[in-house]
Amino acid sequence: MPLKPISFRWSKTSVRSVPNPFMYGPDNLNKPLSRASQMAERVHQQTPSSTNYQQRRYFSYYYYQFPKIPRPKRNMLYYSTWSRNPVTNASNANKPSKRHMLPFGSFKISKRSFANANQKLKTKLKKLKMGKERRRFIRWWTVTSLTIVLGGVYAKIKYERGDHEENPYKIRPQSWHLYAYSALPLKTISRLWGQVNSINLPVWIRSPSYRVYSAIFGVNLDEMENPDLSSYKNLSEFFYRDIKPDARPIADGDLVSPADGKVLKFGVVENGEIEQVKGMTYSIDALLGIDTGKLAAPTHSLNFDYNSDDETIVKRDEEFAKINGISYSMDDLVGGNSKSTYHMNELTYKDEHDGTAAGERASFSKELRVAEELTPNPVEYFRKKNLYFAVIYLAPGDYHHFHSPTSWVTTLRRHFIGELFSVAPFFQKTLQGLFVLNERVALLGYWKYGFFSMVPVGATNVGSIVVNFDKDLKTNDIYEHEVYSSASSVNESTPLLDQKDYSANDILTITNSEYEDKKRKKLRKNTVYEATYTNASRLLGGYPLSKGQDIGGFKLGSTVVLVFEAPENFKFNLKVGEKVKVGQSLGGFV
């Protein structure tokens, strides 16, 4: 019995419930395409939004959306590269291996690679990994190289400055304000300030500028030797102005003030320490350089414009010694005749084939060595005498010259290369060893009671320290003086007083062409440059200075420190904070 074809009735309301017409085959096998077209058209009418989307997407009127084959999303870590450590032997199954005792010790890299991964993805990951490793290597190499280079540069600068040596008075600020201040290039700033002060001002602006400065810092214009303010070309000349001779009368006492300023501290040196402020001290050895074992250049004897062997000069020195009670035979320095007594003109030496023996007359190097041995340690020879000190601060408005505080003989000059911190009272209370750290010039010698020294100390914006009779002294500079650069080579083990004397005449005989070939050395911090004044007087062994005599000065305000030996009955007639002037009595004997 033949089967009847199954027919379906279509309606808009029953489209979704009618089964697929092709499930059991088409009604008319002769028209399969028309039937399929009708079904496709009906499906297309039921989904107008998708049709419009496809038309907009593919710019066509009709598009048949073929079914997509679903592809599972594969995880890249599906095939793990880590696998458990297999048990190779049944007998070792219960024994933990060494891998299990370590972190991730039970894992190992599998031989199976990402064989099913996309080759392009593998290449991309490989390039990313190589780029990351390259950047990591570059960063490591760059940082390491820069660290080594900068460390070497810092070490070189530190060595040239002399910071490689341990300084017990090194600034260790307790606050970031002082640390930032100590890190400033104060020497460079001071040099620039000195150059600015040396710029000549127009005539019309000189007088108003100097009057404004005088009003700010309290300068007394009435005592100026030259009252015409327009005659001072620049600020430097105005700072270093002269005053009338009768403006500073000299007192009759044994010791007078060397400068105008405020008394910061005075007293007796105890245990070789000078009190800066209460609870803060610094060593006298560090201030004067008594124990300095090496110099930046050989010691040389300064030459003067006159002949010390001239009969007039000898008589002048004899009269100076008699008036001021100074013995040129060094008897007063050692307390009479004993095994330790040496007379400057009576020293004899054995010829030890070192070139120092010169018959009956002593060489200057031997005389200086004896003087350096005896003079800095006078307490050993003067049991009834003390070492005293006084510190006087010069403000920017004060008279900037310093004078001789007594009649004495200076035999040695030591120029200490250091910092240029401010010496204002605030920093003296804050920075320990301030006067030891700063650049200074120590004039050492003797007076009728024993050892005597005067130390002008530099400060911030102090262009230079001037000593009138020392033409080779140049402070706050970058390079050392030509005298030291022209001398023979010297190493760090050079003793304080060399076996050989270097006179300025011998050194300056080098021609200009030879000197130009020699490169000037830069000044190194914490080093000393030394000169002797023995050529000033064969009789006194140094340069004689009378009480009240103008010695030199500062280009701006600073500090003067006196360290001297005197009997126990010497008393200061001062008060801390008192204002003193040149020639005013500092103390006397009671």
Swiss-Prot record:
EC id: 4.1.1.65
Molecular-function GO terms, alphabetical: phosphatidylserine decarboxylase activity
Keyword Coiled coil: no
The protein, known as: Phosphatidylserine decarboxylase proenzyme 1, mitochondrial
GO biological process: cellular response to neutral pH; cellular response to starvation; filamentous growth; filamentous growth of a population of unicellular organisms in response to biotic stimulus; filamentous growth of a population of unicellular organisms in response to chemical stimulus; filamentous growth of a population of unicellular organisms in response to neutral pH; filamentous growth of a population of unicellular organisms in response to starvation; lipid droplet formation
General function of this protein: Catalyzes the formation of phosphatidylethanolamine (PtdEtn) from phosphatidylserine (PtdSer). Plays a central role in phospholipid metabolism and in the interorganelle trafficking of phosphatidylserine. Important for virulence.
Intervals, Mitochondrial intermembrane compartment: 160-590
Phenotype upon loss of function: A psd1 psd2 double mutant displays diminished phosphatidylethanolamine levels. It exhibits defects in cell wall integrity, mitochondrial function, filamentous growth and is less virulent than the wild-type.
Cofactor(s) needed: pyruvate
Residues of the active site: 260, 403, 558
Pfam families membership: PS_Dcarbxylase
Species of the source: Candida albicans (strain SC5314 / ATCC MYA-2876) (Yeast)
